[in-house]
Every structure is written in structure tokens, then in C-alpha cells.
């Protein structure tokens, strides 16, 4: 009887141990190295999607938080050096409330820049896709829509322009 009980316990433990799946540690953006099918709601209320992107244009996606000091510094640096980033479409994406994004956009006068799109990711798709741990997170795609580089804690304009 003891042998039967011990054998049963071992079977249960083995079943539980082998039932555990290894967590997939490779982020989705590395598995699928092309621009994802995203949808953000811009501060003007319109949707901006992958299909909205201009053809043959590099893309910079910056996932940020408007109240993050590093994100504010990153934004200012990008705006001050826009001559180096003018050839790219820049998406500033956050999860915060739209009112906060509008305030951020107005503060930095983002509407002056035709290549910048700021909006909210209401489904939290992009941070999940990029496995964002810190903000600002920056992903760069080339003219063909192929993933080039990710910066997990922001990047200088010089670093970014090297990948455009």
C-alpha cells in the first residue's frame, strides 16, 4: 500500500513538473521583425494605423509617459534636433488619458511637426508587443518596414539617426 501511495505521489509530481511550460522570453518584435499592425487614437480623435504610415519612410516609435522626466527630456532633445529626424515618421505613443496627451502635445507644440503623430494605445498593444519595461522605449524601423534597433531606455538623436 505504501509503495502504491508513493508511486502515485511521484506520478502526480512528475505530471505537474512536466506540465509547466517554459516562458517565451523572446519579445514579439524580435520574432516578427516588421512594423506591427497597430492602432493608436491620436489627440485629434482620429485613428492612426500601420496603413496610415507613408510609404518608404523610416519609423521611430517612442512609447512614453507624459509625466516621466526622462521622456520629457527625450522629447525635447528630439525636437531640438529635428533636422536629423525629419526624414522619419515619429510616433509618440502612451497609455495615459487623452487629456494628459493633449496637454503634453500642446506644451511641446507637436502640431508644428508634420512627421510627428502622438496618440493613445487604448489596448496596450505596443508595450506588450515590445515588452516595454522602462520609458522612454524607442523602436526604429527602416524604409522597408523592417525592425532595425530598440532602445530600452531612450537614445540620443545621434544614436537614432545612425539607424535611419
Could you describe each region identified by the protein language model?
Residues 1-25, 164:
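Bacterial Sec-dependent N-terminal signal peptides
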Residues 35-36, 59, 135-136:
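Short loop/turn microsegments at loop-to-beta-strand junctions
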Residues 50-72, 78:
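Short active-site neighborhood of thiol/selenol oxidoreductases, capturing the structured segment around
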Residues 57, 134, 140-164:
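Thiol-/selenol-based redox modules, centered on thioredoxin-like
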Residues 72-110, 125-128:
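Structural microenvironment flanking redox-active thiols in thiol-disulfide oxidoreductases
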Residues 108-139:
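Short, internal strand/loop/helix patches
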